[in-house]
Amino acid sequence: VDDDLTAAAFRRAFRDADGVEPMPLPDGEVVDSLGSDIGPLRDALTHARWLHVTEQDTGGAAATLAAWPSTGVQVDFFFGWGAPIAFDFDLRQLIGDEDVQALARLLRLVSSVVGKDVVVRPEGERDGQPALVVEASTGRCRLLPAPPG
């Protein structure tokens, strides 16, 4: 458990430097992930007993795997997009500290299985500074301060 990883701190990290509320679907990515990382990650997610997982593949469209690390918190992995592995979740679903901790647990699993860092940026800022980083080397999940406005 990361003591500084609270729902309030999470909301602050995703808020713009000028205090504007963020768009609700931040962009997550497994840094430098490859197509060959998708299979092991899919297997780990579907076999984790503490996750509820469903997969959707609509006739050749991009396969999406939805994972619920806690009731009411859904993380969508877009495996059909190929590499790097991309995902998103809805900030509005992270109501309390338990929800944020459950998300962090899921992202640590992702980082551990693939052996690569995981970053989450505010929605639409795919090349911007991450608000959240999970370090593969340590398993540490940390929030980064918003850049100065």
Which ranges hold each PLM region?
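Short, extreme N-terminal segment that most often corresponds to the first beta-strand
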Residues: 1-37, 144-149
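Glycine-rich, often proline-containing surface loops adjacent to acidic residues and nearby aromatics
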Residues: 27-28, 80-91
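Acidic (E/D-rich), amphipathic helical modules within compact regulatory domains
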Residues: 39-65
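Short non-domain terminal segments
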Residues: 8, 12, 85-87, 95
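Short glycine-rich, low-complexity/disordered patches
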Residues: 20-31, 52-60, 112-128
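An N-terminal amphipathic alpha-helical segment
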Residues: 58-85
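Short amphipathic alpha-helices in soluble, non-transmembrane regions
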Residues: 8-17, 40-48, 102-106
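Acidic, proline/glycine-rich low-complexity IDRs
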Residues: 89-149
